[in-house]
A protein has these predicted regions:
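Amphipathic alpha-helical substructures
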Residues: 50-72, 76-77, 292-310
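Short acidic-hydrophobic, aromatic-tinged amphipathic segments that line or gate anion-handling sites
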Residues: 75-81, 218-219
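Terminal amphipathic helices with adjacent charged low-complexity linkers/tails
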Residues: 77, 85-91
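Small-residue-centered hinge/linker elements
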Residues: 1-51, 55-59, 63, 89-194, ...
Length: 310
């Protein structure tokens, strides 16, 4: 099984287990319950439906047709689009001379916001986006490249017009090295300007690593975060190649572990060496969280272990 410092770090489980581990089932059930309680509470409050009734409706699939939604109070009316004009009129919304209503599309709204930005003051708040898995190196696209994001943060740090920075994080994590590169630049930035992290749907593992130096961290009730933990994967293909394709390997080598790779199982010493690196990253991670959030390391360890939270 892959080396891991955390029993809740479940990303490796599909490769080594036929079903969820007890620890993963525990954390996933609590996450699901937390998310459902938040959603159900909001619906219950907004629509005046008590939680017991809402859970019964959900369990028995009592709302599957528009008429069901109307009956149970999930919607107020069932109308065609053209009938909405009557609703607008009842609400006192003014139409033009042709009886039509002027709608603003999202694109038009964005253009207006851009036009308004021309009148901004000399002092600015920079918004930097960190969206996607965290990977090493430089680049652009659907991932967060460690060196590229660090350079962006360095740029806003050097910009005298920027008085504060908001980092919008929406990431499941990724490379520990890239996360540390970003973390370092966040530390340098924080020393000079206020830094606020705004978490999106998730800011877990490396996503939390890069967030923890911020002066303030803001999350949504449904944000999945935490997962403070580390794992290492080392693929061994020797059995699959031998049993499926009849391919075998032999080698000569200069040193004991010179042949360490996918075509040979790890020796106890090799596994211990990898685990040493995993443990080092985990210790660094938990210490940085303790430092950034001003918490005792023991408190961080209580909520770490790779466990996700909402």
């Amino acid at each position: 099984s892959p080396p891991t410092a955390c029993k809740y770090k479940s990303a490796v489980e599909p490769y080594i287990l036929p079903k969820m581990s007890d620890a993963n089932r525990e954390q996933m059930q609590e996450l699901v319950n937390s998310m459902w309680n938040t959603i159900a509470g909001s619906v219950a409050e907004a629509r005046g439906i008590d939680l017991e009734t809402l859970n019964r409706i959900t369990d028995k699939l009592e709302v599957s047709l528009p008429e069901d939604a109307l009956e149970h109070g999930f919607v107020d009316s069932l109308l065609y689009e053209d009938q909405m004009n009557d609703v607008f009129a009842e609400l006192g919304v003014q139409s033009d001379s042709d009886g039509q209503y002027n709608f603003v599309t999202l694109g038009e709204y964005a253009l207006q916001v851009s036009a308004d930005l021309k009148n901004i003051s000399a002092d600015q708040v920079a918004i930097v986006y960190a969206d996607g898995a965290i990977v090493d190196g430089e680049g652009f696209g659907r991932e967060i490249y460690g060196n590229t994001l660090a350079a962006t943060l360095a740029g806003v740090r050097a910009d005298e017009k920027v008085k504060a920075v908001v980092l919008r994080v929406n990431s499941p994590g990724g490379s520990a090295l890239a996360s540390d590169v970003i973390w370092r630049e966040m530390e340098l930035l924080k020393a000079e300007k206020p830094v606020i992290v705004s978490m999106g749907s998730y800011a877990a593992s490396g996503g939390y690593y890069i967030s923890c130096p911020a002066d303030v961290i803001v999350a949504d009730k449904l944000t999945l975060t935490g997962s403070i933990g580390v794992f290492g994967m080392y693929l061994n293909t020797i059995d699959a190649l031998k049993n499926k394709l009849g391919i075998t390997f032999d080698a000569v080598k200069s040193n004991t572990s010179a042949g360490m790779g996918m075509t040979s199982p790890l020796t106890p010493a090799e596994r211990a060496s990898i685990m040493r690196g995993v443990d080092k990253v985990y210790t660094t991670f938990t210490n940085l969280v303790a430092q950034g959030r001003n918490l005792p390391v023991e408190k961080v360890l209580d909520i770490a272990g790779g466990r996700g939270w909402s």
